[in-house]
Amino acid sequence: MTENENILAGLLQNVHSWTELKPKLSEYNTSTTDTTTKTTRAGKLFEYFTKLCFLYDSEFSEEYNCKEIYLYDEIPTDLRQKLNLPSVEHGIDLLIVDHDEQIIAVQCKFKNDETVKLNWNADKLGNFFGFARNANLHCIFSNSSDITQVAQNLTDNFKFFSYSHLQNISAATFEKMRTALIGLPVKEITKPTPHDYQ
């Protein structure tokens, strides 16, 4: 388990909702003051969290049907070369290959202020779209409430996951994430099969 995975597993302890997790992540996203030093580790932790969402939350896992999912540093060299991606990450935080071999590029953006709108320049969204040009779908996954219209209108193959999506993640999904991080088998919730007459 990496250091970030270990930290995230600890943060997920006794967490049942995004509302409970968000303040814990914010502690890893601070400016330099008299009592704190600057850290942006929350961004990396949010990337790991996003990966877990695509693996274990039904809204994401069913829609995107992940065959393979990689943090940028985990992308195999041959796939990186096929997509003409640089060795250093410049905006793509996750890469998903679905069961139809479609490539989904994901950028993750964590904000302490969830009411803020993601900005094209300040949040460097252009880097993501520039380096992810060979992807079939472009996703921005953020806890912010909105995104600039420029990003929304850039391509038809775009999806923005916002604060409202995070609010819908179930307590059972948070438990699956924590369980997966600590290396225990994840229990799948089976839906009852309706009888023929139902």
Question: Each predicted region: which residue ranges?
Answer:
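Generic N-terminal initiation segments characterized by hydrophobic and/or small/turn-forming residues
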Residues: 5-9, 18, 115, 122
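Sequence-level detector for tyrosine residue identity
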Residues: 28, 48, 56, 64, ...
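Nuclease catalytic cores
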Residues: 23-51
